From Swiss-Prot:
Residues 45-310 form the Protein kinase domain. Residues 1-44 are annotated as: Interaction with ARHGAP33, ANKRA2, CDC42, PRDX3, RAD26L, RBBP6, RPS7 and TRIP4. The keyword Ribosomal protein does not apply. The modification Phosphothreonine is found at T202, T210. Autophosphorylated. Phosphorylation at Ser-206 is required for its activation. Phosphorylated upon IR or UV-induced DNA damage. Phosphorylated by CHEK1 and CHEK2. Interaction with APBB1 down-regulates phosphorylation at Thr-210. Its EC number is 2.7.11.34. It comes from Homo sapiens (Human). This is Serine/threonine-protein kinase Nek6. GO terms for cellular component: centriolar satellite; cytoplasm; cytosol; microtubule; nuclear speck; nucleoplasm; nucleus; protein-containing complex.
Amino acid sequence: MAGQPGHMPHGGSSNNLCHTLGPVHPPDPQRHPNTLSFRCSLADFQIEKKIGRGQFSEVYKATCLLDRKTVALKKVQIFEMMDAKARQDCVKEIGLLKQLNHPNIIKYLDSFIEDNELNIVLELADAGDLSQMIKYFKKQKRLIPERTVWKYFVQLCSAVEHMHSRRVMHRDIKPANVFITATGVVKLGDLGLGRFFSSETTAAHSLVGTPYYMSPERIHENGYNFKSDIWSLGCLLYEMAALQSPFYGDKMNLFSLCQKIEQCDYPPLPGEHYSEKLRELVSMCICPDPHQRPDIGYVHQVAKQMHIWMSST
């Protein structure tokens, strides 16, 4: 879900939505062998409008009739796109995501299966996202001030550190998944489920099938790990400064892109506009060897120091 059709912002209040008020529906084990806890049903929501869609999902702005909260309701055709094992893993992952509680993370409020669809109830953030902000500055032919870069990046790091501390990887950090509220609060969305809904959120697609944020270990199919999230954070920090992905190219094919990623071949950030600390952190995160990348604790600490320093100057 990003700030474009098929990827939408989510945000809003998350207090006890449907968790105690919702009707309990007995599961049908034959029809829904991997049913999540039935806390809500579609009858509990008034759908207002569609705000996003993917190949196997649609997202709606909706009102929960039980407490009048405005939410995002994502409907996923789970039985068409997954086998039984993938459904089980997806259900388990959603259970973990519901336990996350952080001011900079889109809250997973509830989930249930109805009419052969997985319905995920999410906090709704109805402002913009980081990709839209980057496009705006690019159109204006202006760089994002470094103070602003750290203001948002430190909040993003706080969100990722919360996830990693609970052994949850994001797997799809990119500007379109970083929502910004009207008051300047970052909300990280599309948590951890990208591999299940692969047709719509596998990687950062600026061109169809072009994964600009894919780490070297993923190119080599060595699996995703916590340091892969760090690579993506480095790419995002670079993009906030340069207004484009470090590995972007106008006429690249997938092979040449993968070569650039493996060799960490990207243009340096302008030293006259951005601090050595920012450029150094980008270099540490966009490192081909995942073992050489810092952990999220270090990245967050640097971001906090720079945010405080920039705010005081």
